Amino acid sequence: MALRHLALLAGLLVGVASKSMENTVTRNSTAVINTQAEGTLSPPGLSSLPVVREWALTHTAQLPECCVDVVGVNASCPGASLCGPGCYRRWNADGSASCVRCGNGTLPAYNGSECRSFAGPGAPFPMNRSSGTPGRPHPGAPRVAASLFLGTFFISSGLILSVAGFFYLKRSSKLPRACYRRNKAPALQPGEAAAMIPPPQSSGNSSCRIPLWGFPSLGQSQGALWVCPQTGLPGSGSRPPLPGSPGDPPTRQGQGRIWLVPPALDLSWIWPAPPARPPLIPVTSMLFPVPETWGLQERRTHHDRADPQYLLLLEVQLHPRTDAAGLRQALLSSHRFSGAGSGGPKSQPVRKPRYVRRERPLDRATDPAAFPGEARISNV
């Protein structure tokens, strides 16, 4: 964009320079023609005398302004055709020519340096077309052209650089807050908006990771993760209710999976008391039948004697149901763990949105945490 403006300014400069040169050449040619015509003019009756014409051409350089010292109207100049600026040539009755200053019975012209007079019959009236010496261009023309070009160049360059610098600083976030609009959310690409929104729950089997209820320290820790089909979001803080009394028999058969969190011990070492230095074993898993729910009852009985360092993490695979209200329904679910040999649940791929529709209310906060709520994604 800057190169385009520079090319435009260069073309403008060339045009102005060519125009001024053309005007200068035209003025010089006109002045030379007028000078030659005035030098060849002669009063009536003396046009055939070559002596007068030769004498006028010879004394052209000697008397450039012959009417400067002429006071009277009838005063005559040696070279009648060499009247300077501010004077005019007047033919007398005897055939002689006189250079008379403007103001002695004459009418002022347009610029004040020329004058008009009532010349004799048949005598051409020479008018001085320039305020200076005939044949010379005006001394201020090149300066005006140069000043015009330089002024246009510097003004346009300053505007272009200022606009480019403003947008560069705004892009790099180096401007003060007053230069940014607060009532508009930043423009998010569809991929960015889709990445900020959590994926929906799959329609098949889903994983429910629940801390052990027998250990209060796990429920109070910051790392406790509550993800269940009832809530759908981690960290919601809603805990599933405790199962009923220990005497209530289970109503369904099923299987679950226990994952030992490293460092962990064998199940026989946790109760009644853990050893002083537990061995380091890899993460293992084991299947257990749901009717033998030793975990819930034993943790209620022995949670005071258990060491919080050796905690178990129970991961159950169940079908999402609206009436499933806690850990009891998860343990008694008739759906088995899918992908038991792979070591983890399998989730369905998340469908990407086709387009993103953003709403821009006037009172919108600039907090980055509010960005996911500002984008509305539709899969229609």
From Swiss-Prot:
Glycan attachment sites: N104, N111, N128
Which residues belong to the signal peptide in this entry?
1-18
For this record, the Gene Ontology CC terms, alphabetical, are: membrane
Task: Quote the Pfam families the UniProt record gives.
Answer: DUF4501
> How the protein sits in the membrane?
Single-pass membrane protein
Keywords, sorted A to Z? Glycoprotein, Membrane, Signal, Transmembrane, Transmembrane helix
Top-rank taxon, per record: Eukaryota
Indicate what this protein is called per its UniProt record.
Uncharacterized protein C1orf159
What organism is listed for this UniProt entry? Homo sapiens
